[in-house]
Amino acid sequence: MPFSIVQTKGALYMKQWSKTALMKSTGVLLSAFVLLSGCGSATSTNNSEGSADKKTVELLNVSYDPTRELYQDFNKDFAKYWKEKHGQTVNVKQSHGGSGSQARSVIDGLEADVVTLALAYDIDAISKKKQLAEDWQKRLADNSTPYTSTIVFLVRKGNPKGIKDWDDLTKKGVSVITPNPKTSGGARWNYLGAWGYALKKHNNSEDKAKEFVGQIYKNVEVLDSGARGATTTFVEKGIGDVLIAWENEALLSQKELGKDKFEIVTPSISILAEPPVAVVDKVVDKKGTKKVAEGYLEYLYSEKGQEIAAKNFYRPRNEKVAEKYASQFPKVQLFTVDELFGGWKKAQEKHFNDGGVFDQMYKK
């Protein structure tokens, strides 16, 4: 098999993804990154008292790989808002990693007050373990997805391999970087984006789609366990000709390192990526943090929360904010998981479960 799988364990405190961090960091992939943000020092509040009676409340947001900058900004703003409105200090801890790995951590006992993961299937997996209600997606607007993204290609300045669309990723001599769909939610969006393109190109032929996607993955040089790790491999380590990436991650790379180093190629057809959010009922009931946790997620839908999402290159749901940032996001023909794959449950079972299509294509 022409690629290696990079898997590491451990945790570090996350640093802001600045230009210095990109160029000087070790690039080690981590299963969890923890950031303390908000006002005041971290104070444990894990007890059964109601959060409304506490002067300081601590939340843990377990999120997927590329949301570090988003929630670093959002947590500070939410803490200020909540302090002014309710007189409480809120400290938010962040844990980041591949979405699938993060979901398993919550299932295994990581006490997340809220989860903000890459795809609904990962939160459904937590729900199946009775940690939150089955109808969790109905609690907030837009199926509990306050912002969206899509999948694009990041190439080096001048686009030396002439990458224009998904077909170019199958060509001999093109080195592709993408994360491992067994551990990364972003990687599953990447994979289904390629599969959906192939279906539309080849009159819905599953065999042709399998052949097409298989050829892309034959060109993959490294499969990191998460989207940020894949970005580090491409951007910092200089490996690969093209990175299949979240749009927000590609735009952030340009912002941090400059358009003189990288270009973004938007494919003719891509997938509507909808990363959802949810309160983990079992944890907030135990800790007495339900009111704050619910307010935290609701604030994502506020105009200020939507502004923060847009500034961090996520496509906002709010029409007013979306119009303001329209020039930032190119128009692209999008399809959904429901339209082409019958929903995440079917897509997961067919493609990513043990023994599924991905394993069939890449077993040694």
Regions found by a protein language model. Give the residues of each.
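Sec-exported extracytoplasmic/periplasmic mature domains
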Residues: 75-84, 107-111, 120, 127-131, ...
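N-terminal segment of the mature folded domain
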Residues: 50-183, 326, 362-363
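Ligand-binding pocket segment of bilobal, Venus flytrap-like solute-binding proteins
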Residues: 202-268
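Bilobed "Venus flytrap"/periplasmic-binding protein-like clamshell domains
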Residues: 68-73, 182-211
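Short helix-loop capping/hinge motifs at secondary-structure junctions, enriched
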Residues: 158-164, 183, 196-204, 283-291
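Extracellular/periplasmic juxtamembrane helices and adjacent flexible linkers that interface
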Residues: 284-364
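Short, low-complexity disordered leader/linker segments with a strong preference
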Residues: 1-58
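Residues embedded in well-ordered beta-strands
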Residues: 152-154, 263, 276-278
